[in-house]
């Protein structure tokens, strides 16, 4: 199957972590024998001037790729504006909603209207969790599948707990951007309540200076790391924490489980579909005491956890790629007109 991949997030030499889950899924589709061509944006294609130009270029590149590659189907990531590029190709398309793109609908009537147009003209929509699918509330007649981007269990394997030579107690790890939504400030407050252990923070963002200034004793900032660097930090940790105010799915969560690590995750969003008391704790992200209690509960679980590894295996990249391939194949078998007019049973665009 000839697939044209369109995404506004994709890794580069400067930002190897940026949209790496999209790239890995594309590679998994290639490994299944598909011919996948990429038309993508990178982290540098951002800013009030750069962004419109980048999307205009993305549209031109997508149309040129259609003429040259003649894809059977377009596989797009993120609803708007990437979905508008998919529409312009006039090829049947499947689009994945990741969460932030769904939140954007609530912030702007214009984005909401454009998103509905993208949904109605799609052959299918893939959501990374049941939570995202519920938040999306796709119009009647739109096919919705729930498939996350998968975790590379061939690369991320369970490793024994590293020896605590300094006797400092549990080693907690946070992986993600340093923004309000990720709730790292409350994680730091919860960690301070424990009175022991270490907390390593991997990632960067606008709150880094503030978080460094208020970090309790035992906190270490590791900065933005490559995928291999993240894997190395997971191997050193006992518990990986993801206490976001809202988390659509949680890629770092699956990576931690694949390494056999216990997790602490927000109960608001997709993690509630994965995390059980046998592999971690779900917490109230607004309650520091709840986060602290979850950290203690997770720290008491075995490391490496075979149950965590088993759960991660259900989301292994080859399994998810096979599911995505099936959705793409169904879309490719349909009329090309799917890509240029509303689906049967859906209301006309407004």
Residue ranges of model-derived segments:
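Conserved donor-binding/catalytic core segment of Leloir-type glycosyltransferases
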Residues: 4, 164-200
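Nucleotide-activated donor-binding/catalytic signature segment of Leloir-type glycosyltransferases, i.e.
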Residues: 209-228
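Carbohydrate-associated surface elements
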Residues: 131, 150
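Conserved acidic donor-binding segment of nucleotide-sugar-dependent glycosyltransferases
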Residues: 277, 281-288, 297-302
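Acidic anion/phosphate-binding donor-loop and adjacent secondary structure
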Residues: 106, 151-165
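Aromatic "clamp/platform" in nucleotide-sugar-dependent glycosyltransferases that forms part
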Residues: 245
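Short hydrophobic beta-strand element within catalytic cores of glycosyltransferases
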Residues: 262-265
């Amino acid at each position: 199957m000839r697939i044209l991949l369109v995404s506004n997030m994709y890794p580069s030499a400067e930002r190897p972590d940026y949209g790496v889950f999209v790239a890995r899924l594309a590679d998994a589709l290639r490994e299944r024998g598909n011919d996948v061509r990429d038309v993508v944006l990178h982290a540098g294609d951002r800013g009030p001037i750069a962004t419109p130009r980048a999307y205009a270029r993305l549209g031109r590149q997508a149309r040129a790729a259609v003429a040259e590659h003649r894809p059977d189907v377009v596989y797009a990531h993120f609803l708007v504006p990437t979905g508008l590029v998919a529409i312009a190709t006039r090829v049947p398309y499947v689009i994945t909603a990741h969460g932030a793109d769904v939140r954007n609908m609530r912030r702007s009537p214009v984005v909401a209207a454009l998103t509905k147009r993208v949904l109605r003209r799609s052959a299918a929509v893939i959501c990374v969790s049941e939570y995202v699918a519920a938040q999306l509330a796709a119009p009647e007649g739109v096919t919705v599948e729930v498939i996350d981007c998968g975790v590379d269990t061939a690369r991320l394997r369970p490793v024994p707990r590293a020896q605590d030579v300094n006797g400092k107690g549990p080693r907690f790890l946070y992986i993600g951007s340093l923004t309000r939504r990720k709730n790292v400030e409350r994680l730091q407050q919860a960690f301070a309540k424990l009175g022991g252990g270490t907390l390593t923070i991997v990632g960067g963002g606008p709150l880094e200076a503030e978080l460094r200034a208020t970090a309790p004793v035992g906190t270490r900032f590791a900065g933005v790391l490559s995928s291999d660097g993240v894997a190395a930090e997971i191997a050193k940790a006992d518990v990986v924490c993801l206490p976001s105010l809202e988390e659509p799915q949680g890629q770092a969560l699956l990576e931690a489980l694949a390494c056999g690590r216990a997790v602490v995750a927000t109960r608001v969003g997709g993690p509630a579909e994965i995390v059980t008391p046998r592999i971690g704790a779900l917490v109230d992200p607004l309650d520091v005491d709840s986060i602290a209690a979850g950290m203690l509960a997770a720290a008491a679980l075995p490391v490496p956890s075979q149950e965590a590894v088993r759960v991660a295996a259900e989301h292994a990249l080859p399994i998810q790629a096979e599911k995505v391939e099936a959705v793409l194949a169904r879309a490719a078998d349909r009329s090309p007109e799917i890509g240029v007019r509303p689906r049967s049973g859906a209301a006309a665009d407004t």
